[in-house]
């Protein structure tokens, strides 16, 4: 019995550490692609946070504040997709860039809701800027998918 309890405790800890390391990897990936926004990118501050009505963040925030804001935003995005289980982080990262509504209404989310895990092409399809394929966005989507998708 003790061995079983020990195994369950170790498994729970390992799962939590794995989830934390995936979240950390996701945050670092976002930071790499977003970069720390300069004042001329207003209303975007930090690592791509769009200022909301009533928020008083300054456009010249330091890296520590920007990092904390990114993590808080990403956690909020992941909570929106908690019903998607292990895919909540993948969808949260995408929503960080394009918004929750677009992700929730997408064919990607529909396929996952229906149990279809063949979603690579749908995920990478979020690579357009003004209707044209962006090589940088395509690279970002491929990296996000490789990093966060677990089949």
PLM regions: where:
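Long, amphipathic, charge-rich alpha-helical segments that form helical bundles/coiled-coils
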Residues: 88-102
């Amino acid at each position: 019995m003790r061995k079983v309890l020990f195994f369950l405790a170790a498994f729970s800890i390992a799962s939590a550490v794995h989830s934390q390391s995936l979240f950390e990897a996701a945050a670092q990936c976002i930071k790499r692609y977003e970069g720390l926004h300069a004042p001329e990118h207003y209303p975007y501050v930090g690592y791509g946070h769009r200022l909301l009505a009533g928020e008083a963040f300054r456009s010249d925030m330091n890296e520590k504040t920007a990092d904390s804001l990114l993590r808080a935003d990403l956690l909020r995005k992941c909570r929106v997709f908690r019903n998607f289980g292990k895919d909540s982080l993948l969808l949260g990262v995408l929503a960080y860039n394009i918004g929750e509504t677009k992700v929730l209404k997408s064919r990607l989310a529909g396929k996952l809701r229906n149990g279809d895990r063949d979603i690579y092409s749908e995920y990478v399809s979020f690579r357009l800027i003004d209707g044209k394929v962006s090589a940088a966005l395509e690279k970002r989507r491929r990296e996000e998918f490789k990093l966060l998708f677990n089949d």
